[in-house]
Amino acid sequence: THRMSSAASDVYKRQALQSECRSRGGFVYATCYRMRPAKHADDYPGETPFHLTMVHDLYCVQSLVDGKEPTHISAQAHYNQKGSMDLALAQLGWPDGSLATFSAGFLTPEAMSAEGFDRMEIFGKNWMARMHPNPRPLEVWDENYVPPMTLEILTDSNTNTGMLAEELRCFCKVVRDLEPIPKGTRYQDGIQVMRWLDRLTEASENSGKLSNQDD
């Protein structure tokens, strides 16, 4: 349940990126990074970067492609000396030529923040956007540079203010039948992402096990 509802925690990020993609004709390439401390591989036994961190970016890209199924899926995984997965790589492609790559790992050293770092970049036709969800400014470039949006406040008059406020108000509107359940937060969206994760995990196993066990 937690994983299926995890898209709600990134609602602000999805809204901002969806708005840019809609207004600019979609994206050509998306690349997503989520890196966490190396000790996560041992602190969370049985968890993998696919399911613990990459899942959030899969939800986000799912909303950008309007839930369309990818026609290409491939993945690779790396394992540490203890045999725990510490890096997951994934590639998804869609019929219109859109591509998305994902990197999620437990690789950052102790000197870095315990929260690690996240980054997402979207490239379209003559524009690009970069999102740092941790923290969360959004930067956009086209012919000009758009200054970062450093606060969780959208200037659109039809948009609620703040990530938590948006989630609560959206929930209230949905239960009162004032608006439909947002794409990316529905039960079927969670099932679709879980299906993608299953296919990515299988693809990574079929691609061979990369490790530094003999180093």
Question: Where do the model's predicted regions map?
Answer:
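Adenylate-forming
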Residues: 13-17, 116-118
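C-terminal helix-rich "cap/oligomerization" subdomain common to oxidoreductases
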Residues: 95, 170-215
